[in-house]
Curated annotation (Swiss-Prot):
SUPFAM superfamilies: Autotransporter. The gene is ompB. NCBIfam families: autotrans_barl, ompB_ricketsia. GO terms for cellular component: cell outer membrane; cell surface; extracellular region; periplasmic space. Transmembrane segments: none annotated. Changing V251A: In strain: Indian tick typhus. Keywords: Cell outer membrane, Membrane, Periplasm, Secreted, Transmembrane, Transmembrane beta strand, Virulence. Residues 1335-1362 form a propeptide. Changing I959V: In strain: Indian tick typhus. Residues 1367-1655 form the Autotransporter domain. This is Outer membrane protein B. Belongs to the rickettsiae OmpA/OmpB family. It comes from Rickettsia conorii (strain ATCC VR-613 / Malish 7). The 120 kDa surface-exposed protein is a major structural protein which may play a role as a rickettsial virulence factor and/or immunogen during infection. The 32 kDa beta peptide may serve as a membrane anchor. It has been shown to adhere to biotinylated Vero cell proteins. The lineage of its organism: Bacteria, Pseudomonadati, Pseudomonadota, Alphaproteobacteria, Rickettsiales.
Length: 1655
C-alpha cells in the first residue's frame, strides 16, 4: 500500500495528530497527491473486518489489515466491521445484490458509499458507542479505478475501471446511532452547496437518533427522511448546511428539536444554514420546539416555493421560533422563500440579524403571526421577485432593501413597524416597495442615527383605512390615503421626499384624507394632484409658532372646502419649489388673529403662486394670517376673502387681488420693489378692508396696478375702506380711462405715488363721501371728474389732473399739502360746476391751477375762499387765468385768509395768491390777510392793480420783470395808506410802474423799474416786510417835489437810482443805517440828501449829486470801485472806510469834522489800495484827523529790495489838513516787510513797504536754539541775501519766528565737525589695537621681561595703549579683537553735540623678523552710528569703515623699545539732515536731506618706552610718542527735499597728538590651570597742531557759500583703562578690557574682547 510521508509518520507516532486529521491528510496523500497506487480490497465468504479478516488477502502473509485509503468492495453477502483505529478508507463499493451491514467499531473515515452497480441495495451503517464515522465523499477517477490493485498487487479494477463521483453516497441506507452516543460527520472533501447539495435519498434513514450527533462540518446535505430530525444534536459548521426535504407523516408535519433534540450552529461565524422545504405530499408544517438559531449564529431558511407551509413555535405564536431576542439571542439570518400564490406562515416570534424575503415569482406571500425583530443592526432584503409580507405585531425590519421589487409590507391596526427601508440599495435611482397600514399605526426608524432615512426611494406609504398613521424621520416615498378617515400624522422633524395622493393604493383607491403635524415637517412633492378623490380634506399644522411645514410640490390640492389649519399658536407653511408654478387649492383657516406664516420667500419672479381659497377671516373679529412672504413670485389671490397681517414682497414680486375683500395690515418690501394688481374679473369691484396698508412711506411698492379687462374696457372700481393707505412709486392702469377710486368709509386715506399718466393711461374718477379725508401725495391723473361730498377733504400733494373738481353739497374742501411746486390741470366747462367750500393751502409748495380745453368759459373748480394754514408760509397759489382779486365778474366774492403768520428763521415771509390775464381793484374793506398774517398778492401778467384799501394787509409783487402796474390811492388826509411791500426783493422781478397818489407807509420793498411819488406826496419805505430798493424812484410828477424817507437798515441795490423831475428839488432822507445807491446826477441834483440817524453807517455804492449832502456822524463805507460825491456842500464827521475802492470829491467843498478818520486796505496780491482823489474844483477842509488805519493783506513775495510805495490821497494839494498817525494792521503770511505813511513832496499821502527779511530772520535765529551756534550769523546773512533761491522764497511763507528759525537754522548749520571727529576717533581706536599687539610681541626677544610680561591693554586713542600681550613662545600668530565704543560729546562752544556708537573688529597677522624686530599687517571693519544732539537733534549719520594697517616694533638697548603703525581707511558716510518746507498756506512740514559721500583717512604713529621692574611682581612701563591723522571728504549733492538740497564741497582735516602715559602690569596668576595677566594704564593725549577744515555749502542759485561751524572740542583728553588676558595653553589666548576716554564735555566708554592663536 502507499506509504505515508515521513513527516506524517512522525506526527502520528508522536501522537500529535488526531484521528480525523490523520484521515484527511492520509486521504489527500493517497489520492490527491497520487503518491501511492490505489488499493482495493474485496470481501470474501467469511466474516469481514478491516483488520484483515474476510478479504482477498494473499496466502502468506494472511489477514493483513486493509490499507488506509483503500477501496472496500463488498463482493459477498457478508457484513463489514470497521475496526481499524483512526481508519481512513476511500469508500465502500456495493458489488452484491444484498443490503449489507457495516459496523463502525473504531473512529473511521469513509469517502464514497456507492451502490452504483446494485442500486436496489444499500449499506446499513451501525455506529458503536462513542465512535465517529466521518464521511468525506471522496471519489476516484477512472485512472485510479482502472489501476487499482488487490492484495496480490495485481490490478483489480474498481467499477470496471469507471470513475466514482465525489459525494456518491447512494449506497447509504439505515444509519443506526446505536444504544449509546455516537457521531456521524459529513466532512466532504469536495464540499457541496445549497444549490447543489449532497442528497441522501429516501433509503437514508436514522435509527436511534436520540443517541446520535450529526456534524455537518464541510458541505451542504439534503435529507429526505424526517428521521434525521430525531438526531439528538445536529451541529452545522460555518458556511455549511442541512436541508430538510422530508417525507410526510400523517399530518404533513416535521417536528424539530423534539424530545430534547437540538440544532446548533457551532462555527466561529455562525453562518451554517438550516433549510426547511415545504413540499407536496410531504412536510408543510414545521413545528419547532424551542427556537432555531441564536447567539448571532445560524441561518434558517423556510421555503414554501412548492406548497404553502408553516413554521411554528411548538409553544405557541407568542414563543420565539427564530432566535430568542433582538440582541445577542438573534439568529444570524432568516430566509423565507415563496412563489406566486404560495404562502409562508411563521407562527412564532422571529429574531434574526439578517432576514431575506424572496419569491421565485411574483407574488408570494409571507405572514408573520408575531413579532419580527432583526435588532438595531439587522437587515431585511427582498429578493428575486415581488412578494407581500403581512405582520401582526410590532416589528423591526432593520435596514430593509426592497431590491427594486414591487414588494409590500402590510401593517395591521395599532401596530408599529420599525426599519429603514430602501427601494433599491444597489441602484439608488430605482424606486420600489410599499408599506401599507390597515388603520392606525406607526412607521419609525430602526436606527439610532437620526440622519438615516426611514424610507429611501420606496414607492409609497399607504394609509388604507380609517385611522392615524404616525410617521417620523426622513422618507423618500409617496403618501397615499385610501379612506376619508385616513390620517398621516407627522412627528417633529419628519421629511417626506415624495408626493401625496398621486397614485392609487395597491389594490385600492385614493380618498380625501388628512395630514396632521406634531411639529416641523417637509413634504417635497405635489399633494392631491391626481384629480378626483385624490385631493386632501385638510392639513393641520402643529400648534407651535416655531414649527414649519415645508412644501416642495407645485400643486397643493384640497378637496372642496378643504383647509390648511393654523391652530391657536400659528405655525409656518414654507413653499420651496423654485422650478414650477405653484397652486394651493385650500382655504387657510386661522384660529388666532395675527398668527401663522406662509413663507414663499424662495420663489423667483419666473413663478406664479396661486391661492385658490380664503385666507383668514375678514369681519367684525378679524383673524389675519400673521405673515405671507411671496418672495419674488407672481402671487394670485383668486378665490375668497383674504386677511393678512403682514404681506412680504421680495424684489420683483407681485400680488394680484381679485373681486374679493382684502385686509392687508401692512406690507414689507424693499423700497421701490413689489407690485399689487387689482383684477376683479367677476364683478369689477375690489374692496380693501379697513386698516389695509399697501406699501409704506419709507418703503413704497414699485407699483399698484389696475389690470386689463381686455376688449370690454370695463371700469375697475376700488372700494377703499377706512384708514386704508396705498404707497407705491407708481399706481397705474393698464387700460386707458379705467380705474376709479371710491373713498366713503370715513377716516383718513393716503395714496402715495404717481397715480396714472404712465404711458398716457389715465384713471377714471375719484369720489369722496362721508367725511373722508384722502391724501394724494404724488402726481395724479384722472380723465373723469373728482367729487367731494359730506364734509370730505381731498388733500393734494402732487400734480393733479381731472375733468373738474366739484362739491354737489358745497361742503367739500380741496387742500394742497404739497412741499414742492405742483400744477392742477382742469378742463374748461360748458356749464358751471358746484362750488367747493374752500381751497386750503397747508404745504410750503407752490400751486398752479391751470385750465385747458375749449368746451366753454366756465372754470373747472370754483370757491369763494382761499385759506393758508399749517406749513404754507411762503407758498404761492396761481389762480386760473381770468380770476381777479376783486369780486367783479365773479359769481362769488373772493376772501384770502391766513393763519400762518410771517416770521421765519431767516426773516419775513408771506403766502401769496397770483392772478393773471385780468385787472384787479381791491376795495376798502375786502378781507385779505390781517395784521398778524400778512399775505402776498401778485400779477402773473402785464395787468393793473388799483388799491383803494386804506390798509392792505398784503404785499404786492410781479412774476415777470418790467410787467405790471400798481396804483396806490388808499391814503386819506392825515392818514397815510399802508401797504406791505411792492416787489419781493432785490434781484426779483420789477414792476413796470408803481405810482403813489397819496401819502403812504410802505412797510416793505420797492422793486420797480420806476416808482413815481407824485408832487407833494411823502412815502416812507422799508419795514417788517422788507428793506430793499431796486430800480428807480422819481420824485415828483411834474415839479419834482416828492419826498422819500428810508427806514433804518435800508438796502439799496448798487444800480438803484433816485431822480427828480426838476433839478434841485425833492428830498431824500435816511433814518438809520443804509446801503445807498445813486442819487441825482450832475445835471439834475436833488435838493438834499440827509442821514439823520444816530451812530449810523452808510455803505456808498453809487454816486450822489445833491445841493446838500449831510452825512452827519455816519461812518462811511465805500462799497463801489469809485464813488463820486458832487454838488454844493458835503459834511462828513465819521470814519471813511475806503476798503480797496476810490472816493472821489468831484466838486464843491467838503468839510471833515473832528471825528473824521480814514481806514484803507492794501492788497499786495494785486496792488490795490483804497484811496481818495480830490479833483480840481473840489476842496477838502480838515483839521488833524483821527488815526489813519491801514489794513494790509500781504501774502505777496518779499523777494524785492528797497521800498515800494502806494498813494493814499491823490490831489493832496487840495487837502487842507493833516492825517492822524498811521496804525498798520497786517494780515497774511508775510512778516518780512515794514510799512510807513509819509506825505510826499507834492503833498500826496503815500504808504511805504520796505524789505526787512535780514533783520527778522536774524532776530528769529537769535531767539532760537540756533542762536549760539558759532558762525551762524554770517551764514544767515549769506542766506537772506541770496534772494533768488527757492529756499529764500519758501522762507517768506513762514507764519512765525519759530518756523522761520527752524527753516533757516537747519540750512545754515551742519554736522561736518562732529562726523570728522567721530571718524578720527575710530581711526585712533584701530591704532590702539595695533599698539596692543606690538607691545606683546616685542617681549619675545627680551628674556628679562618675560616673567613680568603683562596682558594686552584696552583701546586708547594712541598707538601706545598700555597693557601689552603676555609672553609668546612662538614667532608669529593671528589675532582678532572685537570692540564696542559708546561716546557722548555734549554741546561745547555753541557747537551741537552728538552720541556715537561704534562696533568693530581688528584682525591681524604678524611674525618676528629677528630677535628684535616684529612686523605685521591688519584689517579693520567698523560701523559707527551718530545721533546728533541739541539744535541738530534729529539728524543722523551712519559711517561704514574698512581699514588696512602695517605695524612693527623694534627692541632697542636694554629695556628700551620703539613701536609704530601706519593706517589707511576708506569710509562710506550716509548723512540724513532735517530740513523744512512751507506749503502755500504757510503750513510747515519736515523733510530729510540725504547726503552720501566717501571719506579717506590715513596716518601713523611712533612711540618709545622703557620697561622698569619697580618691585617683585610689578612692571611699570612709561611711554611717550606722536600720532598724526588726516581726513578727506569728497564733494556731494544732497537729495530728498523740495527747496533745501545743498551742494557740499570737499574738505581736508588733520591733527597731530602728543601721547604721554604709563602702564602697570602684575605678575601671572594661576587659576585652575589658567594663566591670568592683569594690567592697568593711564595716558594723556594732547592735540599739538592741526585743524578741522570748514565745509562750504550752497543752495541752488546761491553764489556765496555757507561756512560750517568750527571745531570747539577739547584739545586734551585722558585715558584710563584695565585689562586681563587668560591663557589655557601656549597656543590659545583670550582677553577682556575696558577703557574710559574723558575730556571737557566728552565721555567715551569702550569694551574689548580678544582671541589669539599662536603658531
Amino acid at each position: 500500500m502507499a506509504q505515508k510521508p515521513n513527516f506524517l509518520k512522525k506526527l502520528i507516532s508522536a501522537g500529535l495528530v488526531t484521528a480525523s486529521t490523520a484521515t484527511i491528510v492520509a486521504s489527500f496523500a493517497g489520492s490527491a497527491m497520487g503518491a501511492a497506487i490505489q488499493q482495493n480490497r474485496t470481501t470474501n465468504a467469511v466474516a469481514t473486518t478491516v483488520d484483515g479478516v474476510g478479504f482477498d488477502q494473499t496466502a502468506v502473509p494472511a489477514n493483513v489489515a486493509v490499507p488506509l485509503n483503500a477501496v472496500i468492495t463488498a463482493g459477498v453477502n457478508k457484513g463489514i466491521t470497521l475496526n481499524t483505529p483512526a481508519g481512513s478508507f476511500n469508500g465502500l463499493f456495493l458489488n452484491t445484490a444484498n443490503n449489507l451491514d457495516v459496523t463502525v467499531r473504531e473512529d473511521t473515515t469513509l469517502g464514497f458509499i456507492t451502490n452504483v452497480v446494485n442500486n436496489a441495495n444499500h449499506f446499513n451503517l451501525m455506529l458503536n458507542a462513542g465512535k465517529t464515522l466521518t464521511i468525506t465523499g471522496q471519489g476516484i477517477t477512472n485512472v485510479q479505478a482502472a489501476a487499482t490493485k488487490n492484495a496480490n498487487n495485481v490490478v483489480a479494477q474498481v467499477n470496471n475501471g469507471a470513475a466514482i463521483d465525489n459525494n456518491d453516497l447512494q449506497g447509504v441506507g439505515r444509519i443506526d446511532c446505536g444504544a449509546a452516543a455516537s457521531t456521524l460527520v459529513f466532512n466532504l472533501a469536495n464540499p457541496t452547496t445549497q444549490k447543489a447539495p449532497l442528497i441522501l435519498g429516501d433509503n437514508a434513514v436514522i435509527v436511534n437518533g436520540a443517541n446520535g450527533t450529526l456534524n455537518v462540518t464541510n458541505g451542504f446535505i439534503k435529507v429526505s427522511s424526517k428521521s434525521f430530525a430525531t438526531v439528538n444534536v445536529i451541529n452545522i459548521g460555518d458556511g455549511q448546511g442541512i436541508m430538510f426535504n422530508t417525507d410526510a407523516d400523517n399530518v404533513n408535519t416535521l417536528n424539530l428539536q423534539a424530545n430534547g433534540a437540538t440544532i446548533t450552529f457551532n462555527g466561529t461565524d455562525g453562518t451554517g444554514r438550516l433549510v426547511l422545504l415545504s413540499k407536496n405530499a410531504a412536510a408543510t408544517d414545521f413545528n419547532v420546539t424551542g427556537s432555531l438559531g441564536g447567539n448571532l449564529k445560524g441561518i434558517i431558511e423556510f421555503n414554501t416555493v412548492a406548497v404553502n407551509g408553516q413554521l411554528k413555535a411548538n409553544a405557541g405564536a407568542n414563543a420565539a421560533v427564530i432566535g430568542t431576542n433582538n440582541g445577542a439571542g438573534r439568529a444570524a439570518g432568516f430566509v423565507v422563500s415563496v412563489d406566486n400564490g404560495k404562502v409562508a406562515t411563521i407562527d412564532g416570534q422571529v429574531y434574526a440579524k439578517d432576514m431575506v424575503i424572496q419569491s421565485a415569482n411574483a407574488v408570494g406571500q409571507v405572514n408573520f403571526r408575531h413579532i419580527v425583530d432583526v435588532g438595531t443592526d439587522g437587515t431585511t432584503a427582498f429578493k428575486t421577485a415581488a412578494s407581500k409580507v403581512a405582520i401582526t405585531q410590532n416589528s423591526n425590519f432593520g435596514t430593509t432593501d426592497f431590491g427594486n421589487l414591487a414588494a409590500q409590507i402590510i401593517v395591521p391596526n395599532t401596530m408599529t413597524l420599525n426599519g429603514n427601508f430602501t427601494g433599491d440599495a444597489s441602484n439608488p435611482g430605482n424606486t420600489a416597495g410599499v408599506i401599507t397600514f390597515d388603520a392606525n399605526g406607526t412607521l419609525a426608524s430602526a436606527s439610532a442615527d437620526a440622519n438615516v432615512a426611514v424610507t429611501n426611494n420606496i414607492t409609497a406609504i399607504e394609509a388604507s383605512g380609517a385611522g392615524v398613521v404616525q410617521l417620523s424621520g426622513t422618507h423618500a416615498a409617496e403618501l397615499r390615503l385610501g379612506n376619508a378617515g385616513s390620517v398621516f400624522k407627522l412627528a417633529d422633524g419628519t421629511v417626506i421626499n415624495g408626493k401625496v395622493n398621486q397614485t392609487a393604493l395597491v389594490g385600492g383607491a385614493l380618498a380625501a384624507g388628512t395630514i396632521t403635524l406634531d411639529g416641523s415637517a417637509t413634504i417635497t412633492g405635489d399633494i392631491g394632484n391626481a384629480g378626483g378623490a385624490a385631493a386632501l380634506q385638510g392639513i393641520t399644522l402643529a400648534n407651535d409658532a416655531t414649527k414649519t411645514l415645508t412644501l416642495g410640490g407645485a400643486n397643493i390640492i384640497g378637496a372642496n372646502g378643504g383647509t390648511i389649519n393654523f391652530q391657536a399658536n400659528g405655525g409656518t407653511i414654507k413653499l420651496t419649489s423654485t422650478q414650477n408654478n405653484i397652486v394651493v387649492d385650500f382655504d387657510l383657516a386661522i384660529a388666532t388673529d395675527q398668527t401663522g406664516v406662509v413663507d414663499a420667500s424662495s420663489l423667483t419672479n419666473a413663478q406664479t403662486l396661486t391661492i385658490n381659497g380664503k385666507i383668514g377671516t375678514v369681519g367684525a373679529n378679524n383673524k389675519t394670517l400673521g405673515q405671507f412672504n411671496i418672495g419674488s413670485s407672481k402671487t394670485v389671490l383668486s378665490d375668497g376673502d383674504v386677511a393678512i397681517n403682514e404681506l412680504v414682497i421680495g424684489n420683483n414680486g407681485a400680488v394680484q387681488f381679485a373681486h374679493n375683500t382684502y385686509l392687508i395690515t401692512r406690507t414689507t418690501n424693499a423700497a421701490g420693489q413689489g407690485k399689487i394688481i387689482f383684477n376683479p374679473v367677476v364683478n369689477n369691484n375690489t374692496t380693501l378692508a379697513t386698516g389695509t396698508n399697501l406699501g409704506s412711506a419709507t418703503n413704497p411698492l414699485a407699483e399698484i396696478n389696475f389690470g386689463s379687462k381686455g376688449a370690454a374696457n370695463v371700469d375697475t372700481v376700488l372700494n377703499v375702506g377706512k384708514g386704508v393707505n396705498l404707497y407705491a412709486t407708481n399706481i397705474t392702469t393698464t387700460d386707458a380711462n379705467v380705474g376709479s377710486f371710491i373713498f366713503n368709509a370715513g377716516g383718513t386715506n393716503i395714496v402715495s405715488g404717481t397715480v396714472g399718466g404712465q404711458q398716457g393711461n389715465k384713471f377714471n374718477t375719484v369720489a369722496l363721501d362721508n367725511g373722508t379725508t384722502v391724501k394724494f401725495l404724488g402726481n395724479a391723473t384722472f380723465n373723469g371728474n373728482t367729487t367731494i361730498a359730506a364734509n370730505s377733504t381731498l388733500q393734494i400733494g402732487g400734480n393733479y389732473t381731472a375733468d373738474f373738481v366739484a362739491s354737489a353739497d358745497g361742503t367739500g374742501i380741496v387742500e394742497f399739502v404739497n412741499t414742492g411746486p405742483i400744477t392742477v390741470t382742469l378742463n374748461k366747462q360748458a356749464a358751471p360746476v358746484n362750488a367747493l367750500k374752500q381751497i386750503t393751502v397747508s404745504g410750503p409748495g407752490n400751486v398752479v391751477i391751470n385750465e385747458i380745453g375749449n368746451a366753454g368759459n366756465y372754470h373747472g373748480a370754483v370757491t369763494d375762499t382761499i385759506a393758508f394754514e399749517n406749513s404754507s408760509l411762503g407758498a404761492v397759489v396761481f389762480l386760473p387765468r381770468g380770476i381777479p382779486f376783486n369780486d367783479a365778474g365773479n359769481r362769488i366774492p373772493l376772501t384770502i385768509k391766513s393763519t400762518v403768520g410771517n416770521k421765519t428763521a431767516t426773516g419775513f415771509d408771506v403766502p401769496s395768491v397770483i392772478v393773471l390775464g385780468v385787472d384787479s381793484v381791491i376795495a376798502d374793506g375786502q378781507v385779505i390777510g390781517d395784521q398778524n398774517n400778512i399775505v402776498g398778492l401778485g400779477l402773473g401778467s402785464d395787468n393793473d392793480i388799483i388799491v383803494n384799501a386804506t390798509t392792505l394787509y398784503a404785499g404786492i409783487g410781479t412774476i415777470n420783470n418790467n410787467q405790471g402796474t400798481v396804483t396806490l390811492s388808499g391814503g386819506i388826509p392825515n392818514t397815510p395808506g399802508t401797504v406791505y411791500g411792492l416787489g419781493t426783493g432785490i434781484g426779483a422781478s420789477k414792476f413796470k410802474q408803481v405810482t403813489f397818489t397819496t401819502d403812504y407807509n410802505n412797510l416793505g420793498n420797492i422793486i420797480a423799474t420806476n416808482a413815481t411819488i407824485n408832487d407833494g406826496v411823502t412815502v416812507t419805505t422799508g419795514g417788517i416786510a422788507g428793506i430793499g430798493f431796486d430800480g428807480k424812484i422819481t420824485l415828483g410828477s411834474v415839479n419834482g417835489n416828492g419826498n422819500v424817507r428810508f427806514v433804518d437798515g435800508i438796502l439799496s441795490h448798487s444800480t438803484s437810482m433816485i431822480g427828480t423831475t426838476k433839478a434841485n428839488n425833492g428830498t431824500v432822507t435816511y433814518l438809520g443805517n443804509a446801503f445807498v445807491g445813486n442819487i441825482g446826477d450832475s445835471d439834475t441834483p436833488v435838493a438834499s440828501v440827509r442821514f439823520t440817524g444816530s451812530d449810523g453807517g452808510a455803505g456808498l455804492q453809487g454816486n450822489i449829486y445833491s445841493q446838500v449832502i449831510d452825512f452827519g456822524t455816519y461812518n462811511l463805507g465805500i462799497s463801489n470801485s469809485n464813488v463820486i460825491l458832487g454838488g454844493g456842500t458835503t459834511a462828513i464827521n465819521g470814519k471813511i472806510n475806503l476798503r480797496t475802492n476810490t472816493l472821489t470829491f468831484a466838486s464843491g467843498t467838503s468839510t471833515w469834522g473832528n471825528n473824521t478818520s480814514i481806514e484803507t486796505t492794501l492788497t499786495l496780491a494785486n496792488g490795490n489800495i483804497g484811496n481818495i482823489v480830490i479833483l480840481e474844483g473840489a476842496q477838502v477842509n480838515a483839521t488833524t484827523t483821527g488815526t489813519t488805519t491801514i489794513k494790509v493783506q500781504d501774502n505777496a513775495n518779499a523777494n524785492f529790495s528797497g521800498t515800494q510805495t502806494y498813494t493814499l490821497i491823490q490831489g493832496g494839494a487840495r487837502f487842507n489838513g493833516t492825517l492822524g498817525g498811521p496804525n498798520f494792521v497786517v494780515t497774511g503770511s508775510n512778516r518780512f516787510v515794514n510799512y510807513g505813511l509819509i506825505r510826499a513832496a507834492n503833498q500826496d499821502y503815500v504808504i511805504t513797504r520796505t524789505n526787512n527779511a535780514e533783520n527778522v530772520v536774524t532776530n528769529d535765529i537769535a531767539n532760537s536754539s540756533f542762536g549760539g551756534a558759532p558762525g551762524v550769523g554770517q551764514n544767515v546773512t549769506t542766506f537772506v541775501n541770496a534772494t533768488n533761491t527757492a529756499a529764500y522764497n519758501n522762507l517768506l511763507l513762514a507764519k512765525n519766528s519759530a518756523n522761520s528759525a527752524n527753516f533757516v537754522g537747519a540750512i545754515v548749520t551742519d554736522t561736518s565737525a562732529a562726523i570728522t571727529n567721530a571718524q578720527l576717533d575710530v581711526a585712533k581706536d584701530i591704532q590702539a589695537q595695533l599698539g596692543n599687539r606690538l607691545g606683546a610681541l616685542r617681549y619675545l626677544g627680551t628674556p628679562e621681561t618675560a616673567e613680568m610680561a603683562g596682558p594686552e591693554a584696552g583701546a586708547i586713542p594712541a598707538a601706545v595703549a598700555a597693557g601689552d600681550e603676555a609672553v609668546d613662545n612662538v614667532a608669529y600668530g593671528i589675532w582678532a579683537k572685537p570692540f564696542y565704543t559708546d561716546a557722548h560729546q555734549s554741546k561745547k562752544g555753541g557747537l551741537a553735540g552728538y552720541k556715537a556708537k561704534t562696533t568693530g573688529v581688528v584682525i591681524g597677522l604678524d611674525t618676528l623678523a629677528n630677535d628684535n624686530l616684529m612686523i605685521g599687517a591688519a584689517i579693520g571693519i567698523t560701523k559707527t552710528d551718530i545721533k546728533h544732539q541739541d539744535y541738530k537733534k534729529g539728524d543722523k549719520t551712519d559711517v561704514n569703515g574698512f581699514s588696512f594697517s602695517l605695524y612693527g616694533a623694534q627692541q632697542l638697548v636694554k629695556n628700551f623699545f620703539a613701536q609704530g603703525s601706519a593706517i589707511f581707511s576708506l569710509n562710506q558716510v550716509k548723512n540724513k539732515s532735517q530740513r523744512y518746507f512751507f506749503d502755500a498756506n504757510g503750513n510747515m512740514s519736515k523733510q530729510i536731506a540725504a547726503g552720501h559721500y566717501d571719506n579717506m583717512t590715513f596716518g601713523g604713529n611712533l612711540t618709545v618706552g622703557y620697561d622698569y621692574n619697580a618691585m617683585q611682581g610689578v612692571l611699570v612701563t612709561p611711554m611717550a610718542g606722536l600720532s598724526y591723522l588726516k581726513s578727506s571728504d569728497e564733494n556731494y549733492k544732497e537729495t530728498g527735499t523740495t527747496v533745501a538740497n545743498k551742494q557740499v564741497n570737499s574738505k581736508f582735516s588733520d591733527r597731530t597728538d602728543l601721547i604721554v602715559g604709563a602702564k602697570v602690569a602684575g605678575s601671572t596668576m594661576n587659576i585652575t590651570d589658567l594663566a591670568v595677566y592683569p594690567e592697568v594704564h593711564a595716558f594723556v593725549v594732547h592735540k599739538v597742531t592741526g585743524r578741522l577744515s570748514k565745509t562750504q555749502s550752497v543752495l541752488d542759485g546761491q553764489v556765496t557759500p555757507c561756512i560750517s561751524q568750527p571745531d570747539r572740542t577739547a584739545k586734551t583728553s585722558y585715558n584710563l583703562g584695565l585689562s586681563a588676558s587668560i591663557r589655557s595653553d601656549a597656543k590659545m589666548e583670550y582677553g577682556i578690557g575696558y577703557d574710559a576716554q574723558i575730556s571737557s564735555k566728552y565721555t567715551a566708554h569702550q569694551g574689548t574682547l580678544k582671541v589669539r592663536v599662536n603658531f
